[in-house]
């Protein structure tokens, strides 16, 4: 096992906040594998790279010799996490949750080592909890403390309804840490209240309090808003290798380093060497290719990554991407047809030219041929090619 200092450096890489660092150091000094917990509510079947920020950190803990608990919130998934929500979320059925959970498991083991992962379902203990135990759990916290949460406070102050079951979500998430005797819990920055609940409940149940590690919400391909399928600025981990590759090599240069830190398993020394190369005049696209190949290989294999790179090169053979690829930002109230985007960005002379190119296969988005039915999502960024020589990286921003 690495030294405490080496472990702490890797644990803190890319993290937003570590509470409490001194407590974690004491846990690490014992030289025993820690129990590292992260919970995921299977409310949607498909994961994107934003979800993998936590999973990547779990893998780093595994590589340090610790025990990872991948908690599937099949019970909490039927409640619906109210974090950051301005309205009550409709709960899912048990069947929907379990179906999504199976899909989750098949996806996360492309990152986690199955032999070093304990998969748990919080229905295992919550379904067995009787009325007396449940009352004991709810007595650990007050309504006044619950209303300290920003989202609950905003809804309460604006007379928006808050269902009683929504108060139960952070309590159940916190109790998961009691049931699993977690030493460390990971979560997004929007989960801090729930993670702190775990610390408080563990003390209430006579356990040593867990440390919490919050990870940032990954920016989407536009580099502005958080990655989200609904915003169209995402990279799904089950997307085809070529699509995944094309999206990653088209991200803004400044965003590349953020993705390296949170998504790559390369050492920070290697990443800093890449930065030095770019500062010395290297083409940022060459570095983005390394990032894209690494991530595609993780989910699809080395051969698929090599094929995606080769195919992208073949698609661009009639006009290599220029080093000074134009960056164009458009503003729109809603998603736009690709023809309108090309016209507004100036890649075509007029709407008629856009229609002709789309009809003849002369328009590519991230290297893939598209037709007139292609819709450009607000919040997304793509490399567009109209004809043989007109290229631009176009971001469609919301008004």
Curated annotation (Swiss-Prot):
Cited Pfam families: S4, tRNA-synt_1b
Annotated SUPFAM superfamilies: Alpha-L RNA-binding motif (SSF55174), Nucleotidylyl transferase (SSF52374)
Its EC number(s): 6.1.1.1
Record's keyword annotation contains ATP-binding: yes
GO BP annotation list: tyrosyl-tRNA aminoacylation
UniProt-annotated binding residues for ATP: 229
Keyword presence, Cell membrane: no
CDD domains registered for this protein in UniProt: S4, TyrRS_core
Reaction(s) the record says it catalyses: tRNA(Tyr) + L-tyrosine + ATP = L-tyrosyl-tRNA(Tyr) + AMP + diphosphate + H(+)
Coiled-coil regions, chain positions: none
Enzyme class: ligase
Residue window of motif 'KMSKS' region: 226-230
Classification via InterPro entries: aa-tRNA-synth_I_CS (IPR001412), aa-tRNA-synth_Ic (IPR002305), Rossmann-like_a/b/a_fold (IPR014729), S4_RNA-bd (IPR002942), S4_RNA-bd_sf (IPR036986), Tyr-tRNA-ligase (IPR002307), Tyr-tRNA-ligase_bac-type (IPR024088), Tyr-tRNA-ligase_bac_2 (IPR024108)
Motif ('HIGH' region): 42-51
Residue span(s) of domain S4 RNA-binding: 336-396
Biological role stated in the UniProt entry: Catalyzes the attachment of tyrosine to tRNA(Tyr) in a two-step reaction: tyrosine is first activated by ATP to form Tyr-AMP and then transferred to the acceptor end of tRNA(Tyr).
Record-linked NCBIfam families: tyrS
Subunit comment: Homodimer.
HAMAP family per UniProt: Tyr_tRNA_synth_type2
Protein name as it appears in the record: Tyrosine--tRNA ligase
Origin species: Pseudomonas fluorescens (strain ATCC BAA-477 / NRRL B-23932 / Pf-5)
Gene: tyrS
């Amino acid at each position: 096992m690495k030294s405490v200092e080496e472990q702490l450096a890797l644990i803190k890489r890319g993290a937003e906040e570590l509470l409490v660092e001194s407590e974690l150091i004491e846990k690490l000094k014992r030289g025993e594998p820690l129990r590292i917990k992260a919970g995921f509510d299977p409310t949607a079947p498909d994961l994107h790279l934003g979800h993998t920020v936590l999973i990547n950190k779990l893998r780093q803990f595994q590589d340090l010799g610790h025990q990872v608990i991948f908690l599937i919130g099949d019970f909490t998934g039927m409640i619906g996490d109210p974090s950051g929500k301005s309205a009550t979320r409709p709960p899912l059925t048990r069947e929907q949750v379990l179906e999504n959970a199976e899909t989750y498991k098949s996806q996360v083991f492309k990152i986690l080592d199955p032999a070093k992962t304990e998969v748990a379902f919080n229905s295992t203990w919550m379904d067995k909890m009787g009325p007396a135990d449940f009352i004991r759990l709810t007595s650990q916290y007050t309504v006044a403390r619950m209303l300290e949460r920003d989202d609950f406070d905003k809804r309460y102050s604006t007379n928006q309804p808050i269902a009683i079951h929504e108060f139960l979500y952070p309590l159940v998430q916190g109790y998961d840490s009691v049931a699993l005797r977690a030493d460390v819990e990971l979560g997004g920055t929007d989960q801090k209240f729930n993670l702190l609940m775990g610390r408080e409940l563990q003390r209430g149940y006579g356990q040593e309090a867990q440390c919490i590690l919050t990870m940032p919400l990954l920016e989407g391909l536009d580099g502005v808003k958080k990655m989200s399928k609904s915003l169209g600025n995402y990279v799904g981990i089950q997307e085809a290798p070529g699509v995944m590759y094309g999206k990653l090599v088209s991200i803004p240069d400044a965003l590349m380093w953020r993705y390296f830190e949170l998504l790559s398993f390369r050492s920070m020394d290697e990443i800093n060497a890449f930065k030095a190369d770019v500062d010395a005049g290297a083409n940022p696209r060459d570095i983005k290719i390394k990032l894209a190949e690494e991530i595609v290989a993780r989910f699809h294999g080395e051969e698929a990554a090599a094929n995606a790179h080769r195919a992208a090169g073949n698609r661009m053979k009639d006009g290599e991407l220029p080093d000074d690829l134009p960056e164009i930002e458009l503003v729109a109230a809603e998603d736009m047809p690709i023809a309108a985007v090309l016209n507004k960005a100036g890649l075509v002379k007029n709407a008629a030219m856009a229609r002709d190119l789309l009809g003849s296969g002369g328009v590519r988005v991230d290297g893939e041929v598209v037709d007139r039915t292609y819709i450009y999502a607000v919040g997304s960024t793509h490399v567009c090619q109209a004809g043989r020589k007109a290229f631009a990286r176009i971001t469609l921003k919301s008004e």
